[in-house]
Structure formats: C-alpha cells, structure tokens
Amino acid sequence: MGQINIEVTHLNFSYEKQNPILQDISFTADGQASIGVVGANGAGKSTLLKLLVGLYFLDSGSIRIGDVPLQKETLAQIRKIAGYVFQDSESQLFMPNVYEDVAFAPQNYGLPEEEVAYRTKMALAAVHIGHLAKKPIHKLSGGEKKLAAIATILSMKPDIILMDEPSIALDPRNR
C-alpha cells in the first residue's frame, strides 16, 4: 500500500439542510498513519467515513484522496484508492460464499482469473479465514463476516483502508 494522504477542507454535511451533522471539518491524514475517529454515538463518525469514499456528497467543502478530488466524476478512481469496511459488515457481503465474495471486487476490475484467484487466496490468508472459503455467507458468525469483509477490501489492494468500528464482533486474536 502506498502513501496517500487524505485532505479534508471545510467539510459541511447535513441530511436535512436545517440540521447540520458535520460543520467546518478540516484535517489532513498522513498516508502512513493509523488514525481513529472518536466521538459520541450519533456524532457523525460513520457519516464522515462514508463521505470520504463518496457514499454521500458534501454540502460544501472539499475532500482529496491523494491528488484526486472527490467528485461524482472521480468516484471510480477514488474507490480503487480507498477501500471501506462497513460497521455492519453484512451490508457488503452478498455472494453465495466467502470465496466468491472476496473474489467479486477483483473480478469487477476485469483482472485475469489467475490474478483474481491469487488476490483472493492472499486476502483470505491475511485474515486467517482460508478454511472458510466455501462456507455460505449466511452461516458465518458476526466476527467471520467482519473478517470476510476485510478480506474483500484487501483483495482490491487499495492504498487506504477505512474501517467503521474495525474491531466490532472480532475476538482479541483478530483485532
């Protein structure tokens, strides 16, 4: 993974214009750092992460990931740079089994099958769930679903990984 900075400048966001969720947020995140966002329930932490990967759009301000400004026109490019693991990992698992789910993203990139198989195998090994490759998604525990979601993002080889509640449902060995 490379060193890609995230730069947020005067970010403002609201679900309803009269009720702002995030106001005048500015920061630069160094590409080599591990950073946590801390705050009370409902403070906008998950919303901020979703804004960073283009799942929501700003009311005003700007976001840059590396040298790419986050805009509707650059979403595909941003999503190759930044991977996102949802708080509820089940939201991003939709294929019949773990292997197919992890392989889905690199297949979508149009990579050759050998590369897809390699990336999938390496991602499953990285989170210690290679033995679950053929297990149906609906039979996974909460922690196994989280690990499968992380493996899915790893298979894409993004420069940045954003994780919402990264250790939720994981046992101490996998945190």
Residue ranges and their predicted role:
Residues 114-132:
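Conserved ABC ATPase "signature" region
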Residues 1-8, 12-24, 72-74, 113:
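A short, flexible loop at the N-terminus of ABC-type nucleotide-binding domains that lies
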